[in-house]
Amino acid sequence: MAVRKIERGHYFEDFEVGHLFKHHWGRTITEGDNSFFSSVTMNFNPSYFNREYAQSLGYKNVVVNHMLVMNVVFGLSVEDLSERAIAHLGYEKMKWHETVYPGDTITSESLVLSKRDTSRPDRGVVKFRTTGYNQRSEKVLEYERPVLIRKRNPSS
């Protein structure tokens, strides 16, 4: 059976500085998600899986692994920002704000900060600021990332 290729994502030319993408979906993070992610990444911080330990540190429950939060916020942005990416060029100015607990629902949005051509005519770099929120609209994470993205028309 042949695989049908579906064209998705934005080209470099499609991004406008100042445009705000409000990424659809959202993801409720469960205690199972948190335990699995922490185990598979070998991040055995007891505050991620031991309620009494987390409470002894002042948290109301186990906390969600910070890197799981980052990956969910990032994942929510992929469809809008980087389906046509050639490469992610890094993550900058990453800052966690509110603690995320199992049961919290994460949403995200991304602002186009800048775009520039590169020395190769078939690609350009777009820089985004992505912000993640919980279900109470509290900021949980914010970071910037430059992405190398294909051009629709390499001569433009």
Task: Name each model feature, range by range.
Residues 1-16, 100-156:
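HotDog/MaoC-like acyl-thioester-processing domains
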